[in-house]
């Protein structure tokens, strides 16, 4: 198959590329097949910001030799598939003969071959951004998912396309998984005089887990080990010419694209790695953290979903640990007794205004220290993708999808062989309030529960875990039925069955969150 075209057409229009605020960025956790309980390769992402929540199951397709692929800027912030307000045609590249079906999301995440990608923005040096380049990271993801079957193919293609046609985005990281391998891909622009790209992909050991949380992480690159490292053309020479590497010290990619003065990890990187491998005794004082670690015990799907819900509650980084109140109560004998407990208003998703208000009431030498939690209320969507080589692709690949705050919303299965999604998943709720968008069904209930989280969580958390258990209980039976249909040669029936199951699961969560919203209004009707 031809993966790269030979020509492109670039529109005259250009737009200033704005670097993402890391506070409104993403977290990706991934695990190799020998690091997981069941042998699946896992990747994940929280899309924290205003990227579109509308999605589309794009079907596989054959194309004529003359076909082109138009590349548009800013589809990631549209309201639906047909919304073209503010969208700019940047250029086009030749199409290939056949494209795979894939799940088109804000950052496209899985195809029919069980190739999956988690994304995080890593920003990097501002001076490396070149708006003359053609591709944003989501464009490269879409093309790779349509054209590739393996993670190695995908990183090679994305790197080659970015070098050939230009990369206009800020620094980005993709955790790219297939049924067998996991790759960590970091890319940035090549500077104002070169619309190309600087990139490195490092293979994660099969028995390791890794994390990316908005800062470059790839350290020393072994240019002689092509099994573990793939790089852009002339990377060392370009880094030296730009003054980012002296040619003598070890070539650390994070230093090249982010500067030695910036730490190559965040609290989220540390928290995930330390949770997975506490025996390593990692600390936040280290100059670097390992890119990946061997977990102390095999990682389950629920370990990853639990980490995506994480607010550090119960740890030294818990922002609510001192939010205690004392109330004088009478016991059964009428004796008064002081009782101290955490305020039901305490929660780790405080706005800046709330945090400032609370700190104004506290001693100046004991402020609440703001922490960037993994779970945030400004999350657009999140997912955990499983790639499983012992199952046919249609059912082996599954994205456990969630909209709004991953600490409050349920996860629903979207299969690699699925052919459609509900209508409420086809519209985005970011530009204005849309009751027909699934995002707002979850968001209304979640925000209401947060007002008095000590009470609201008593509804939300059991519901989240209930649907997680529902998936664990039902998926083996679903897989068995789908595999049986596929063995009988009934591919379309199998895909229709998976699609119906996904729809039913989604509808059950939507109904549950609507019912909980009503219950919360009843509970808080006379005050929070």
Task: Label the predicted regions.
Residues 8-12:
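Sec/Tat signal peptide C-region and signal peptidase I cleavage site
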Residues 14-137, 157-307, 314, 318:
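A contiguous strand-loop segment
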Residues 147-153:
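Short, charged, surface-exposed loops that flank catalytic or proteolytic processing sites
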Residues 240-390, 394, 398:
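Glycine-rich, aromatic-lined ligand/substrate-binding cores of catalytic
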